[in-house]
Amino acid sequence: MKTLFALLFLSACTVSAATEDKINKTFTVSPGGDLVVEVGFGSIEVVADPGRSDVNVDVWRKITRSNTSDEEAYLKEHPVEFIQDGNTVTLRALGNTQFSWSWFGAWRNRNEAHYVVHLPEKFATKLKTSGGQIAVSNVSGSVNADTSGGGLRFTNIHGSINGHTSGGGIKVADCDGDIHINTSGGGIDVSGGGGTLHGNTSGGGITIKTFNGPIEIGTSGGGITVESIQGPIKGHTSGGSVHAILLTPITSDIDLSTSGGGIHVKVSANAAFALDAETSGGGVSSDLPVTVQGNIGRNHLKGTVNSGGPSVRLHTSGGSINVQKL
């Protein structure tokens, strides 16, 4: 038994060896081109550089098997493919994320990869991976990003964004354009920028701060926080509370609802709006005077604040509603 244990231990220790593959390619292009990256596993990072006139690609892959020959065979059977067609650069790498365990928690089979691309600012990107995160920064052009196994991060993008992940959170910072983001496995965090925003998650909370433009957001798995939004707001959660700090003057309609918590709104004392606040699971209170329309009830408050204005609708089935002065 001791001999068997020792052999198993030594076998597990030998798994630590791995074979690495490094590739660097450069393609001459002009602004206004397209980048396409389709990989079976690994993270993708795209960075736009001012004044750049080429696309530079760095590839790092690491394959772990029980022996070197299997690792080298995998790399040979799954090459990285580069194609340039005019002003379009395409990178493809077949293969799937592969993890399996041996005794003592050591990796028996493992595939890792990281793809880094530097390109001109004015470039459109289409990125897809089944096994890692995607990050894009400083691009002036449309961004399409899809991953099944990691988060998404967009920074300083000037153009439309379509981002989807089944396995992580999404962060958007200082981006301007028509933004559509969706995740089944994490939260959404947006700060700065403007345009239009549509965001949905089944697995976390949503925080939107200092965005200039209309937003429509929804989550089944967390709370919602919105602060300093210049534009219409529509947000719903089935799994948490809602917190909002509203800009003054309020210039657009606001609709916030939850099935799983309270709603807490802060607004300046001189803000003018039409309030419609209703709850099935608590009370409604307001620090600001409300000229009531209809009957006064503990669970429903409807009327005008400071002579009225855009609609502020607050509805919850699972908590109280509080409107507070900033």
For the regions a language model picked out, list residue spans one by one.
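Intrinsically disordered, low-complexity terminal regions
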Residues: M1-L326
